Swiss-Prot record:
Modified residues (Tyrosine amide): Y36
Protein name: Pancreatic polypeptide
Localization per Swiss-Prot or TrEMBL: Secreted
Keyword match Transport: no
Homology family: Belongs to the NPY family.
One matching Pfam family: Hormone_3
GO molecular-function term, one example from the UniProt record: hormone activity
Function: Hormone secreted by pancreatic cells that acts as a regulator of pancreatic and gastrointestinal functions probably by signaling through the G protein-coupled receptor NPY4R2.
Source organism of this protein record: Macaca mulatta
Alphabetized PANTHER family for the sequence: NEUROPEPTIDE Y/PANCREATIC HORMONE/PEPTIDE YY, PANCREATIC POLYPEPTIDE PROHORMONE
Origin: domain of life: Eukaryota
GO cellular component terms, A-Z: extracellular region
Keywords (A to Z) from UniProt: Amidation, Hormone, Secreted
Length: 36
């Protein structure tokens, strides 16, 4: 199973937040993808 992305913290840069958001979206997609 994919690892859950780690929240970069309240002092994260916009780049870190964007990367986290992208990783989180990919992570959720992997969790919710139907398994055939």
């Amino acid at each position: 199973a994919p690892l859950e992305p780690v929240y970069p913290g309240d002092n994260a840069t916009p780049e870190q937040m964007a990367q986290y958001a992208a990783d989180l979206r990919r992570y959720i997609n992997m969790l919710t993808r139907p398994r055939y």
